[in-house]
């Protein structure tokens, strides 16, 4: 890096952005370290060799180092001021916006996408009208049922502001962070286009129409599954991609082939450039034609971050060819980072940006170093080293953003990548030919179909192998930083030293350290699942319990909230999944998690659970996925070292035909902590427990029936006198949970109250014998 000014400038810009965002001293220390490295490198290679007699030569020798140091400092300051300017610009209008506010927006239509039967319209160069104020703002997103407007036209739109929601549990999709990284701060609901004026962007609209037509050719000539994959792979059209197929590619570790990136640009762009050079076109003519085609292709595929990076690097390569200079990948990568981040500094927190740049760094910095050291004789060996380098560079980030890594991905890529060029070439050729002749296109798509069938077979085989996916949990960012610093030091040492075998073990140890993120000690997490229940308990002995898990107002709560939470925590399996009763708001997520083939050893019911349709469905799912069924009677206990989880209700004397009334009630207790889990019992069952002296004081109380006014009775709470009470309910739910009477009774008992709809996930840990509560949404 210290021999590449563009990389130094990019590093300065990145550190400046990070310093302004977090304002931490260690970021300034890293910048100072890089600056010292630049100065030391220049002193070692340039300045110390200056002649004392030749003053002119000395002056020239000092000018270049001064320029390099000045550039680094300038870009460091540019990063600080650029991010500060963007933040001030955003806050100027965001501070005035609220959910549900009626506003009018004027902006230029810059992009359109068809998704789920609706057209997503993206406006840039926007002006926002709030009352009497008109403020410039970032991009706006809204949806239309028909595609009546053209790219480039200016639209005046009225609608209701919907601000993006932050994730409310660990591991959940954070819409606010995702869209803010793309400079889209809110969307308009119930949007009405009031006026349209201005000329369309003829080229942009034609490119969009061409994309839609080629996608239509795929739909006409291929199966739905093949269409989804090929449209995503060649056009960036993700709306047709089947969710199951996408997940299969991710688990197999080949989802990168679905993103328009350097692989696509090299196949198409370099293929065309070499063809033009072969037919004796000049460097300039070949470069202009290839560059124009790749620029147009980038626009047609949606100009994602990885696409922009690949296109910019390709342009640098073409420019180098034209002026007769060798191409340096790291310098091109540094220039790409500068251009992208000067346009949008928030992309520094976008997974696609980080993974794209990490993959190229893996190839160039790690892969080329390994190749120089090992000097492989065969292309196979060289490809293996490059693939290993990419994995080494990207796996920590994969673990950070997705909480699991595909174990066999390096092996699978050996089968997938050699024929990807054929698939892309025939797929695009067939798409264009299909505009003229669907029959000829169908012939070209036959090999594409069989390649995709082969990919599917390979993916399914890899997923079926033992330990196909390793749930890593989300590593701390400090671990990631340490990993990359040590990786750089190891590569430097491998270049300088002859004995290198030990460094391989260091690299493997580092990777394992990053990927090992177990839950430690006692922890209780009350998840935000909307109107429902879901709690995770990790004991000191390492046993994993989960209580209920469902929702009536959050769609696919198991898929999008509960399972990502468990993976982010690094929980590889649940030992005992407790089901209080079989209402949908307690089991809908559990069913999804079983269907996702996540490992659950046991599902635990009350001995007196009602034998209804929901219960039978759960039994069938458990049998299908190899989960054992256990039933607890009053007095039964799970022992776990010094801890115990005891069933205190229902017993054989309590009769009812109501699911809620027969909820399984459990008391957990260890040396420091005690808690009671109540399901959806009502005040009648609570009174029964008090009268039969089955309850006593506890540290933690899960409010019965989501804080219902018909539960959480005064006598029951006085008997429990909990230190901490949590209420799991959805925002603006139709049941009025939590009830005012319940809240009054809880507070009267002396308990602190925490609601998931306000706090997000609520975590309880023990420190020095006292419970400590952490709220996920605190400070967000």
Predicted regions and their residues:
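Membrane-anchoring/interfacial helices and their immediately flanking loops
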Residues: 1-10, 402, 416-421, 434
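Membrane-interface helix/helix-cap signal primarily in integral membrane proteins
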Residues: 56, 62, 72-256, 560-564, ...
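Non-globular, low-confidence helical/coil segments that flank catalytic cores
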Residues: 126-133, 143-160, 171, 178-179, ...
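Hydrophobic alpha-helical segments of integral membrane proteins
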Residues: 203-222, 229, 237, 245, ...
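Residue-level signal for inorganic ion chemistry
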Residues: 16, 107, 352, 394, ...
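N-terminal leader/targeting segments
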Residues: 1-93, 309, 357, 480, ...
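Hydrophobic alpha-helical transmembrane segments in multi-pass membrane proteins
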Residues: 4, 8, 20, 47, ...
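Aromatic-rich juxtamembrane segments at the membrane interface
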Residues: 2, 11, 181-313, 318, ...
């Amino acid at each position: 890096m210290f021999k590449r000014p563009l990389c130094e400038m990019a590093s300065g810009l990145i550190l400046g952005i990070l310093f302004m965002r977090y304002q931490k001293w260690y970021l300034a220390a890293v910048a100072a370290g890089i600056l010292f490295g630049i100065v030391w490198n220049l002193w070692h290679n340039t300045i110390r060799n200056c002649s004392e007699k030749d003053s002119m030569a000395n002056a020239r020798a000092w000018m270049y180092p001064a320029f390099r140091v000045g550039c680094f400092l300038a870009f460091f300051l540019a990063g600080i001021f650029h991010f500060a300017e963007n933040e001030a610009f955003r806050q100027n209008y965001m501070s005035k916006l609220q959910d549900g506010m009626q506003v009018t927006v004027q902006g230029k239509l810059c992009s359109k996408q068809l998704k789920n039967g609706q057209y997503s319209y993206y406006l840039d160069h926007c002006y926002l009208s709030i009352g009497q104020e008109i403020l410039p703002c970032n991009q706006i997103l809204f949806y239309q049922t028909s595609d009546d407007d053209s790219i480039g036209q200016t639209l005046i739109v009225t609608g209701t502001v919907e601000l993006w929601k932050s994730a409310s549990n660990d591991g959940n999709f954070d819409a606010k962070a995702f869209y803010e990284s793309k400079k889209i701060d809110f969307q308009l609901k119930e949007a009405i286009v009031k006026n349209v004026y201005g000329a369309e962007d003829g080229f942009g609209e034609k490119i969009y129409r061409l994309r839609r037509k080629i996608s239509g050719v795929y739909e006409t000539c291929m199966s739905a599954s093949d269409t989804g994959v090929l449209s995503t792979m060649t056009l960036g059209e993700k709306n047709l991609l089947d969710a199951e197929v996408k997940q299969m590619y991710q688990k197999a570790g080949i989802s990168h082939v679905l993103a328009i990136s350097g692989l696509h640009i090299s196949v198409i762009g370099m293929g065309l450039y070499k063809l033009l050079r072969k037919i004796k076109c000049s460097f300039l003519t070949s470069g202009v034609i290839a560059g124009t085609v790749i620029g147009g292709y980038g626009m047609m595929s949606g100009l994602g971050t990885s696409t922009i990076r690949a296109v910019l690097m390709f342009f640098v390569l073409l420019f180098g060819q034209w002026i007769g200079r060798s191409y340096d990948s790291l310098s091109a990568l540094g220039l790409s980072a500068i251009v992208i981040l000067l346009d949008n500094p928030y992309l520094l927190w976008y997974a696609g940006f980080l993974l794209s740049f990490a993959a190229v760094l893996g190839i160039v910095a790690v892969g080329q170093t390994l190749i120089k050291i090992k000097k492989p004789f065969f292309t196979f060996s060289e490809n293996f080293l490059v693939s290993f380098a990419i994995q080494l560079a990207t796996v920590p980030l994969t673990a950070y953003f997705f909480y699991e890594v595909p174990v066999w991905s390096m092996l699978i890529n050996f089968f997938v990548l050699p024929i990807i060029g054929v698939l892309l070439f025939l797929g695009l050729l067939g798409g264009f030919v299909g505009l003229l002749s669907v029959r000829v296109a169908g012939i070209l798509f036959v090999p594409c179909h069989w390649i995709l069938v082969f990919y599917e077979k390979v993916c399914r085989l890899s997923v079926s192998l033992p330990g196909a996916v390793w749930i890593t949990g989300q590593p701390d960012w400090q671990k990631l930083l340490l990993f990359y610093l040590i990786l750089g030091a190891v590569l430097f040492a491998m270049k300088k030293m002859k004995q290198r075998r030990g460094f391989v073990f260091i690299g493997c140890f580092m990777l394992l350290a990053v990927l090992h993120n177990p839950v430690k000690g006692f922890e209780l997490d009350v998840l935000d699942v909307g109107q429902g229940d879901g709690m995770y308990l990790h004991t000191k002995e390492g046993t994993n319990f989960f209580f209920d898990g469902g929702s009536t107002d959050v769609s696919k709560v198991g898929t999008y909230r509960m399972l990502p939470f468990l993976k982010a925590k690094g929980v590889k399996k649940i030992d005992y999944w407790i089901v209080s009763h079989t209402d949908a708001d307690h089991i809908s997520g559990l069913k999804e998690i079983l269907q996702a083939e996540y490992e659950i050893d046991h599902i635990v019911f009350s001995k007196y659970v009602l034998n209804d349709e929901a219960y039978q469905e759960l039994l069938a799912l458990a049998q299908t996925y190899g989960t054992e069924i256990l039933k607890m009677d009053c007095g039964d206990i799970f022992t776990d070292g010094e801890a115990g989880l005891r069933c205190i209700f229902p017993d054989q004397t309590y009769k009812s035909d109501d699911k809620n009334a027969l909820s399984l009630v459990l008391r957990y207790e260890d040396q420091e902590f005690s808690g009671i889990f109540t399901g959806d019992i009502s005040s009648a069952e609570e009174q029964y427990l008090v009268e039969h002296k089955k309850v006593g004081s506890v540290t933690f109380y899960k409010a019965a029936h989501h804080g219902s006014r018909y539960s959480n009775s005064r006598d029951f709470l006085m008997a429990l006198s909990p230190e901490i009470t949590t209420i799991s309910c959805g925002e603006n739910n139709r049941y009025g949970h939590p009830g005012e009477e319940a809240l009054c009774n809880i507070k009267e008992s002396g308990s602190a109250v925490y609601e998931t709809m306000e706090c997000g996930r609520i975590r309880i840990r023990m420190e020095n014998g006292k419970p400590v509560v952490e709220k996920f949404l605190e400070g967000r």
